[in-house]
Amino acid sequence: MTTPTLLRVGLDIGGTKTEAVALDPNGRLVGRLRMPTELGAERVLATAERAVRGLSFQTGRPLSAFASIGIGIPGAVDRETGEVRHAFNLDLAELQLGRLLSELVGVPVRVENDVTAAALGANHLLELDGTIAYLNLGTGLAAGIVVDGAPWRGAHGVAGEIGHLPIDPNGYACPCGQFGCLETVASGSAISRAWPHGGEHPAQDVVRAMEAGDVEAAAVVARLVQGAASCVRVLALSLDPQSIIIGGGLRLLGEPLIGGIRATLEQWAEQSSFLAALDLPRRVRVLPKHSSAAAVGAAIIGA
């Protein structure tokens, strides 16, 4: 009798939706589902359990066929204990997510920061080698780093926290306590502050206004583009990666952002032979629109 193949499960728990995937031993996607994330510690746990059981139903496999579960989630993550703290967009102050979910479904669980998981997933899905940097342009700003297929976190686990690199000491206050950080320029929260009348989707609204000829909107978008291009330059000069992958919700702005980043990098290259030699525009890649990178990366981490 042939032993059934064990699957690896990955969850990407975000503030609005949770995505779950199942990978076979070769890393191929054999199951995927999405569902709304319910907020609050108990409901986040319930969402995670429902996602795992949903994958079991979808794949026609019992929970015992799942070798491991990895979870990518925002907030402060203790990778040793599986505890999550200060995940504000999930209305979650503290949750022993790894231990409690494992008790509910009977499968080992590992928990990781969502950006690190997305970096690992992007590296896998795009079949990249060497050193890659994943630039997450979302509500906040951070990067994940992968070296030879493994996440690199640094000595204290803060490698890639470029959102808290100050570039203007006279700039806006950052939640980290500093002033003028990159996150105050190149993030969804920065756009919300600069374009407060943009409704529920200020980034999309400001781009539409720019395209309609609004001068103020054009200045907001230009500041975002300059900040994002600066992030690419920082990652290139500090890590020298083969590829810099742009992910996060802001990437869905498309050409106004991505084309603007490349144009800015090209302009800088014209002004600096040093930057020109680095060929930064060629290194920039964009995560596809419907990519499951964070969930796939979580599945890999869970193994």
Which residues fall in each region the model found?
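Short hydrophobic alpha-helix segments
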Residues: 33-35, 88, 155
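Short, glycine/acidic-enriched loop or turn micro-motifs at the edges of active sites
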Residues: 15, 117, 139
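ATP-binding/phosphotransfer module of carbohydrate and carboxylate kinases, centering on a glycine-rich
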Residues: 1-68, 78-81, 103-107, 121-131, ...
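Glycine/small-residue-rich loop that forms an oxyanion/phosphate-binding "nest" at active or ligand-binding sites
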Residues: 110, 116
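A charged helix-plus-loop insertion that forms the helical arch/lid used to bind
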Residues: 82-93
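A short acidic/small-residue loop/turn micro-motif
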Residues: 36-39, 92, 158-161
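Glycine-rich phosphate-binding loop of actin/hexokinase-like ATP-binding domains
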Residues: 130-185
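Short beta-strand segments
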Residues: 12, 68-74, 112, 134-140, ...
